[in-house]
């Protein structure tokens, strides 16, 4: 397991990255589809920040966590940092596909760190954004 901490001068944690155990990385590289699904969730409890997650899917459509990271916010810089750390763990994967929502930071990170990977958007996120747009136009 790789653990990487980045701190400010004042000692506050601004970023943390955890690459899950070697077994999961080996499973992803050897046995799973070359597909990574990436998303983030905002932490709203005592510890604020953004939890970034990268998962893969096995042949039985089971979700396998590959890496997780926590940063102060969901920005292009934090996504590039997360993707670079992910690439350190998995290396260059041929025919890699990355699925995410349409966050500009993820798109920028995919283009910068995995330029040869196919980057697609999650249909569920596209549908929810369309429904939200329709509700706003009715109001």
Per-range role (PLM):
Residues 1-139:
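DNA-binding interface regions
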């Amino acid at each position: 397991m790789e653990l990487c901490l980045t701190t400010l001068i004042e000692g506050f944690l601004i970023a943390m990255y955890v690459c899950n155990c070697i077994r999961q990385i080996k499973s992803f590289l050897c046995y799973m589809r070359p597909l990574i699904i990436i998303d983030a969730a905002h932490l709203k409890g005592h510890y604020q920040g953004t939890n970034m997650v990268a998962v893969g899917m096995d042949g039985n459509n089971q979700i396998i966590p590959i890496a997780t990271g926590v940063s102060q916010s969901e920005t292009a810089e934090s996504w590039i940092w997360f993707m670079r750390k992910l690439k350190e763990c998995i290396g260059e994967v041929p025919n890699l596909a990355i699925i995410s929502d349409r966050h500009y930071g993820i798109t920028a990170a995919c283009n910068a760190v995995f330029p040869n990977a196919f980057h697609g958007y999650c249909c569920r996120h596209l549908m929810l954004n369309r429904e939200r747009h329709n509700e706003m136009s009715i109001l």
